[in-house]
Amino acid sequence: MNSKNICINVGMNADVSEFDQIEIIKAAGFDGVFFDWERTVDRKREITKAINLGLELQSFHAPFYGMDDIFHADDTLSDKMLNDIIGTIDCASEYGSDLIICHAIIGMDNHSPNDLGIRRLEKVIEYAEKKKIRIAFENTEGIEYLQKILDAYGELPQIGFCFDSGHELCYNCAEDTLAKFGKYLFSTHLNDNMGQTGDEITFYDDSHLLPFDHGVADWNEIAERLHKYNFDGPLTFELVCKNRPQRNVSDKYEKMTFEEYIAEAYKKADMFRKIYNKQ
């Protein structure tokens, strides 16, 4: 149970191109990366560069713009989203990653998962099994959807949970989502924020701050909880180096060069790794 590798997302809303980010990420000391998958964006150059530099392809992140369509829209819109998940599975298979990440839902007002959505998801779950790809669903807003999906499919070997520490704080009202879903744990998206700062849950609070910085997460407690569920995969961080709209909590990052930001990200990620490995 010794998580030695630390991984990070490519992108981060940075001004530096994804192609140029990869070498900087490698030079900082990270062991791997994950990429977003988008039907209209060809990342072959970036992915190939990461492979050639010896970076692990930890996962590919499926689009999430239409996850609510799977549960609440007609077949045309639902199929569009399902086909994008299938596209993400194909990309992972092509480049040798065995994991994709999906949101369970999108939309702060969605709280009514249904059997229709569960039946529709069967298409991608069967395809993932055929391609030998695992799918980890995140704790996002509308945690009822994650519960419904894992109740239906969580015992399948290709279906699991991606723990997002930031979402837990600002979307899930700091509820212990690992206590609910830890037995399904496949992956992490580790980041911090200021919690829910107003009366309503909002995307603007999902700041993706560095650990051990100025967010509200208790990183020792997070390490303890991950250990409780025997997590031994790479410690994967999902970070953003720009402010969300109407927020200024990332001002200090915006003043850094990308090289400075990634060096600081690695320093903080390594701090967490050392705490985790001492558990």
Give the predicted meaning of each segment.
Residues M1-G87, S93, E129, K183, ...:
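N-terminal pre-domain/capping segments
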Residues K4-V10, V33-F35, L57-A62, I100-C102, ...:
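Hydrophobic faces of well-ordered beta-strands that scaffold small-molecule active sites
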Residues G11-E18, G32-R45, D69-I70, G107-S112, ...:
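Acidic-and-aromatic substrate-binding clefts and catalytic sites of carbohydrate-active enzymes
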Residues N52-L55, Y127-I133, Y153-Q158, K228-F231, ...:
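Short helix-capping segments at alpha-helix termini
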Residues F64-N83, I106-L116, I201-L210, P245-M256:
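Surface-exposed, active-site-proximal loop segments in enzymatic domains
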Residues F71-G160, E260:
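Active-site acidic/histidine proton-transfer and metal-coordination neighborhood
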Residues E122-V216:
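Acidic/histidine-rich catalytic cores of soluble enzymes
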Residues H214-K228:
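A short, acidic, amphipathic alpha-helical segment used as a generic capping/interface helix at domain edges
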